[in-house]
Design a protein with these regions (language model features):
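Condensing-enzyme catalytic core of the thiolase-fold
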Residues: 2-475
Length: 475
């Protein structure tokens, strides 16, 4: 085995990508939706558990639209050379995530089904839903079934025990049959170990939950694996599976949902966010290794910063990211913003930009701002991953991509004095600074409990990923 000397400053190349979000089965499809300024959000069907417009248990609005994966979620095992059928009580998220990993590796010309060797690679994955088909099925067979029978005995004290046992048997028959495999694959550590095994990655495989920052946390760990020499290739990704009513109801106690049909980031009077579904994976290598292997490079990761910004300096994490990358802040030409549609969070975001860029001066640098959430909704744990896909393609194609145009843009970003401008139309990404390549920053925020009285400049937990173009003379 070749010994690698740690280099904590080396650029990390994105050499493969995959994604599946509402109406977008690939990075190319997502890019097309972005460039067309098209919302892929869909209205919940007639079988939706909670009728549109009805209030939920927290007396909050239920979203009238949601980023539905629909058929893009159905990744059958035959697509993965899996030898048997999927049990109805198994965790379908596993096969969806495995297919995303396969798609990313195929994009990087690392076809897992065509090689026998194992790569010296790690898998870092953001995923932790409160419910999945496997865990719910086991609860139904155990605690829920016992509770149901106790309720029946309480309200029908004279019912013959034999009749009650017959009811119990019928209830069991109506449920998917449980098995040890489905139970174990419903747990996080077996979930990510499965992906590593199927993709022939022999290194560390971990699953994590950092809320909306999960995609960034997965990238952070993968980058450290490569820079420390613990891996020669890394798979990093995040997933938000189809959202259940139970999850949405719980989330509504903390998050302001929009009742508008579309999410248009950075509106003057936003009504809230729209939840989305989906996931993405990235294949990462050290740049020197990617060049040696003649890989296509979408973009370079220069730094990843995650942490809590204090109330008096909400821009601290952004500053940390640029300091780690060793670059001046004003050389960043694109901010793929959080743009959640939640007023306090967007105000905090624009306040960070104002603090760092200041007022515009003639001849001074400008930074374009936009968000992919208008296209696919707020994909929660996968939100940062979606932003990285968009920003990486923007760097590859040298285009400043648009977002959905707000009816009334937020004044703090739409005013002439601002050094930031909202990207409501696509623009060629022209730079006259030969000393600095094109750079983008992807921002993400965790939700704070909804508080209409919160201060604009309040701190919070956030993530910033700095991306850079691969030099033009190499392409």
């Amino acid at each position: 085995m070749v010994q690698y000397n740690a280099n904590m400053d080396c650029p990390i190349a994105i050499v493969g990508m995959s994604c599946r979000f509402a109406g977008c089965g690939s990075p190319a499809a997502l890019w097309n939706a972005v460039m067309a300024k098209k919302s892929m959000l869909t209205v919940p069907g007639a079988d939706a558990e909670l009728p549109i417009g009805q209030r939920n248990v927290f007396n909050g609005p239920y979203p009238t639209r949601i980023g539905q994966l629909d058929k893009l979620y159905s990744c059958v095992p035959s697509m993965q050379h899996f030898p048997r059928q999927v049990n109805a009580g198994e965790n379908q998220d596993l096969y969806f995530a495995t297919q995303l990993a396969f798609d990313a590796l195929n994009d990087a010309e690392m076809h897992p089904n065509r090689v026998k060797k194992h790569w010296r690679g790690s898998v870092r994955f953001g995923y932790a839903p409160p419910f999945n088909a496997s865990t719910v099925n086991w609860l139904q067979h155990t605690a829920f079934l016992d509770q149901t029978m106790d309720i029946l005995r309480r309200f029908m004290p004279k019912a013959p025990e034999a009749k009650l046992e017959e009811v119990r048997s019928k209830l069991v028959e109506s449920l998917p049959a449980p098995n040890a495999s489905s139970f174990l694959l419903g747990s996080g550590f077996r979930f990510v170990s499965w992906i590593a095994r199927e993709c022939k990655f022999a290194g560390a495989a971990t699953i994590m939950d950092a809320g909306n920052l999960s995609g960034g946390a997965a990238i952070l760990d993968a980058v450290e694996d490569l820079r420390c020499g613990n891996a020669d290739v890394a798979l990093a990704g995040a997933l938000t599976p189809p959202l259940s009513r139970a999850y949405l109801e719980g989330l509504s106690s903390e998050v302001q949902f929009s009742t508008n049909p579309e999410l248009r980031s950075f509106e003057e009077n936003p009504s809230g966010t729209i939840p989305g579904e989906g996931g993405a994976f990235f294949v990462l290598k050290r740049r020197e290794d990617a060049l040696r292997d003649h890989d296509r490079i979408y973009a370079l990761i220069r730094s990843v910063a995650i942490g809590h910004s204090p109330d008096d300096d909400p821009s601290a994490i952004f500053t940390m990211a640029t300091e780690q990358a060793g670059i001046p802040i004003r050389t960043i030409g694109l901010i793929e913003a959080d743009g959640s549609g939640i007023a306090q969070m967007e105000a905090r975001e624009t306040d960070i930009i104002r603090r760092l860029w200041g007022e515009h001066k003639p001849g001074g640098p400008l930074v374009g701002v936009g968000s992919v959430k208008g296209n696919i909704g707020h994909t929660l744990k996968a939100a940062i991953s979606a932003g990285i896909v968009k920003a990486a393609l923007a760097l590859k194609y040298r285009v400043l991509p648009p977002q959905l145009t707000p009816d009334a843009p937020l004044k703090s970003i739409a005013c002439p004095e601002s050094s930031a401008y909202l990207l409501t139309e696509a623009r060629p990404w022209i730079t006259g600074d030969s000393a600095n390549p094109r750079r983008a920053a992807v921002m993400g925020f965790n939700f704070d409990p909804f508080n209409p009285e919160a201060e604009t400049s309040r701190g919070g937990r956030s993530a910033v990923i700095v991306l850079e173009e691969e030099p033009e003379d190499r392409l």
